Amino acid sequence: MAQLNPRQREAVRYIDGPLLVLAGAGSGKTSVITEKIAYLVNTCGINASHVAAVTFTNKAAREMKERVGRLLRGNAAEGLTVSTFHQLGLRIIRAQRKELGLKSGFSIFDAEDTRTLIRDLLIQQHGAE
C-alpha cells in the first residue's frame, strides 16, 4: 500500500459503507481496488468468497486477478470473484438455470449469432434470396 497516495489509502481503508472511486485513466483505480480487496481479506478477515470485483474488459479482469494474487497470502484468494460484467451475469444465470427454466447446456447469443438466426429464419420463411 506504500505506493498509494493518502486519498487512495483512505479509500482502501474505508469500510463503513459503499465507496465510489472516480478518477481518470492511469490514476491508480485498479491499484486502489486490488489493495482494497487485499485489505478486506488480510486485515479485516473478510472471506474472499464474499468479495466480487467487476470490470468491463477481460484484460482488466485478468490484470486485477494477477495483482490480487500477488497481494493475498496462501490460498486466501480462494473463492474470490474477479470478472467482467458479462462473465458475472453468465455465472449467475448458470447458477440459477433451473429457477429460470433454462436447460443444461443453454447458450447465449451474441450479435453475430442473432444476425445468423434472423437470416436463417427469413430464408426459411421467405425462401433463399
Language-model segment annotations:
Residues 1-104, 108:
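P-loop NTPase Walker
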Residues 112-129:
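Coupling/switch/interface segments within P-loop NTPase motor domains and analogous charged loops
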